Swiss-Prot record:
It comes from Hydrogenovibrio crunogenus (strain DSM 25203 / XCL-2) (Thiomicrospira crunogena). Substrate binds at N227, M256, Y285, H321, S341, R342, G343, D382, G383, L384, R385, E421, Y448. Binds 1 [4Fe-4S] cluster per subunit. The cluster is coordinated with 3 cysteines and an exchangeable S-adenosyl-L-methionine. The gene is thiC. Its EC number is 4.1.99.17. Pfam families: ThiC-associated, ThiC_Rad_SAM. This is Phosphomethylpyrimidine synthase. It catalyses: 5-amino-1-(5-phospho-beta-D-ribosyl)imidazole + S-adenosyl-L-methionine = 4-amino-2-methyl-5-(phosphooxymethyl)pyrimidine + CO + 5'-deoxyadenosine + formate + L-methionine + 3 H(+).
Length: 630
């Protein structure tokens, strides 16, 4: 058995810390709360301009911040939480060997030697207090988290308006928002109101002060989640920490730790103490480990203890499959792929074995009481989601969705934040129906979907089959997309798979923002298009979602530095580049003092005269053309 130390990075050097090309960190201060500093990524262009973009990478891309993974990253929210004076520190539960998948304490202590540096004394709400962002919002309080989010969502829109200053173009491209309320400028008050209404969620456990505030809601930028996690057969703790850092580098707005092997508790400690984004889990996975994988042996008491354990560590949202009811299980019998959710199948098996109602459903208000002590958000799991397009929108799926809507209102009664998980596998023509039903049944609580995959014929390419559905459902109103990697249905993703899945889903989310008409979403596109037209190759690479891949593809055929300033690429070559020809038309127009349209007409007249001078012959000798210079 390898020790805990051997499972961790030998040094901080293993973590990816370099800023992306031509990028540097910039920080914007608050006005209501001047102490806040909102990080963004500034991309410096070769023409002297700067494009500022949303940044999820935390301190890892700021070379001015020293990081020791054994101590964790800076706690940006620590003072905000303390200053509200509604939390208290307490001893917390004692770590049990079963928390880490071991049989006895000696075995566990040997395995996790050296882990104490990351253990924190947990906080909880003082007696009679509620510490959720939803509770504050309903009290009319604009928290530092809310102002932070407002600044972050605006992405220095004042600097990007130069790309959006053509009224005709903006009217033509305004988008279809399907009822979303997209403001020109996000204000802290708007953030507060959206959270108060339950239309948006700020996942922000008081025990995860390292997390930089973000928001999930359809009236904000579409977000992307990345799943990581070890298993009984693959991956070390160190690899999972680096995978989390790697995911945030490429745009993960949240990360779910789905670990199921040994050292689950300790892996989660290391991830949380080093995570600049909210972390989600599926607590039933760890609870199942505690009963040696026998679903029938699960109890409310074991699950409750697991919730408290993870809440004390700082998990920001829990996927809880409380909508898998006993009476819904038979509805899945005629499905092509049955129940494909791990959590859903665990609870279905428990219900059938005991012929009792799902204890997550019967104890739902007890769960609310726990979550509001720490501000853990519900992610109500779709345990009966379709696992194939053949099962999309069936009775089981829709019945569970209605139950999730009922549970949402119970959670809101306790001022606990809620997002709703969605499918799954859904053909394109049925995707909007999913979104419409979710808005209706779940009272506009944010929707969080896995894809959906639009076809089942492409193992190895499911990041694409699902990216299609993700872009569509994001446009229709989904607030957060759970990424799918090329390894979906085939195996656990590695580092490269994580990047591939994230780039695909950031693309889908961005396309959805543009289609919705989100103010400012298209400015980066216009900046890149302008760079492309002006043959600023380095700017094209650096403005893209993956500068490294774009540069590598270009250099496969034109590797020399001189090619980075060439007015052509290897696709068309120097003589057939459409953009070069367009530029020549514009240059000709400028030279002649004409508009582009007039220049084209004048050029046509000149060519017509040349045609007449050559005798109005359709076919002429090449040598004659050469002699006349035409």
């Amino acid at each position: 058995m390898s020790t805990f130390k051997n499972a961790l990075p030998a040094s901080n050097d293993i973590l990816t810390r370099d800023p992306l090309p031509a990028s540097h960190k910039t920080y914007i201060s608050g006005e209501i709360h001047p102490e806040i500093k909102v990080p963004m990524r500034a991309i410096t262009l070769t023409n002297g301009e700067t494009v500022t973009v949303y940044d999820t990478s935390g301190p890892y891309t700021d070379p001015n911040i020293e990081i020791d993974v054994a101590q964790g990253i800076p706690t940006v929210r620590k003072d905000w939480i303390a200053n509200r004076n509604d939390v208290e520190a307490y001893e917390g539960r004692i770590i049990d060997p079963k928390d880490n998948g071991y049989k006895n304490r000696t075995q566990m202590e040997t395995a996790i030697a050296g882990a104490s540096s990351l253990m924190r004394q947990p906080l909880r709400a003082k007696a009679g207090q509620n510490v959720t962002q939803l509770h504050y919002a309903r009290q009319g309080i604009i928290t530092p988290e809310m102002e932070f989010i407002a600044i972050r969502e605006n992405q220095r829109r004042d600097m990007t308006r130069r790309y959006l200053n053509d009224p005709e173009r903006e009217a033509r491209l305004k988008g279809e928002n399907f009822g979303a309320n997209l403001l020109e400028d996000i204000t802290p008050e708007f953030v507060r109101k959206e959270v108060a209404e339950g239309r948006a969620v700020i996942p922000a456990n008081i025990n995860h002060p390292e997390s930089e505030p973000m928001i999930i809601g359809r009236n904000f930028l579409v977000k992307v989640n990345a799943n990581i996690g070890n298993s009984a057969t693959t991956s070390s703790i160190g690899e999972e920490v680096e995978k989390m850092v790697w995911a945030t580098r490429w745009g993960a707005d949240t990360v779910m730790d789905l670990s199921t092997g040994q050292n689950i508790h300790t892996t989660r400690d290391w991830i949380l103490r080093n995570a600049p984004v909210p972390i989600g889990t599926v607590p039933i996975y760890q609870a199942l480990e505690k009963v040696n994988g026998v679903a029938e042996d699960l109890t409310w008491e074991i699950f409750r203890d697991t919730l408290i354990e993870q809440a004390e560590q700082g998990v920001d949202y829990f996927t809880i499959h409380a909508g898998v009811l006993l009476r819904y299980v038979p509805m899945t019998a005629k499905r092509v792929t049955g129940i494909v959710s791990r959590g859903g199948s665990i609870m279905a098996k428990w219900c059938i074995a005991h012929h009792k109602e799902n204890f997550l459903y019967t104890h739902f208000e007890d769960i609310c009481e726990i979550l509001k002590q720490y501000d853990v958000s519900f992610s109500l799991g779709d345990g009966l989601r379709p696992g194939s397009v053949a099962d999309a929108n069936d009775e089981a799926q829709i019945s569970e969705l209605k139950t999730l809507g009922e549970l949402t209102q119970i959670a809101w009664k306790h001022d606990v934040q809620v997002i709703i998980e969605g499918p799954g596998h859904v053909p394109m023509h049925m995707i909007k129906e999913n979104m419409d039903k979710q808005l209706e049944y779940c009272h506009e609580a944010p929707f969080y979907t896995l894809g959906p995959l639009t076809t089942d014929i492409a193992p190895g390419y499911d990041h694409i089959t699902s990216g299609i559905g993700a872009a569509m459902i994001g446009w229709f109103g989904t607030a957060m997309l759970c990424y799918v990697t090329p390894k979906e249905h085939l195996g656990l993703p590695n580092r490269d798979d994580v990047k591939e899945g994230l780039i695909t889903y950031k693309l889908a989310a961005h396309a959805a923002d543009i289609a919705k008409g989100h103010p400012g979403a298209r400015s980066r596109d216009d900046a890149l298009s302008q760079a492309r037209f002006e043959f600023r190759w380095e700017d094209q690479f650096n403005l893209g979602l993956d500068p490294e891949k774009a540069r590598a593809f270009h250099d496969e055929t034109l590797p020399r530095d001189s090619a980075k300033v060439a007015h052509f690429c290897s696709m068309c070559g120097p003589k057939f580049c459409s953009m070069k020809i367009s530029q020549e038309v514009r240059d000709y127009a400028d030279k002649q003092g004409l508009s582009t349209e007039d220049a084209v007409n004048k050029g046509m007249e000149e060519m017509s005269q040349t045609f007449k001078n050559q005798g109005s012959e359709v076919y002429v000798n090449v040598e004659d053309i050469t002699k006349t210079g035409s």
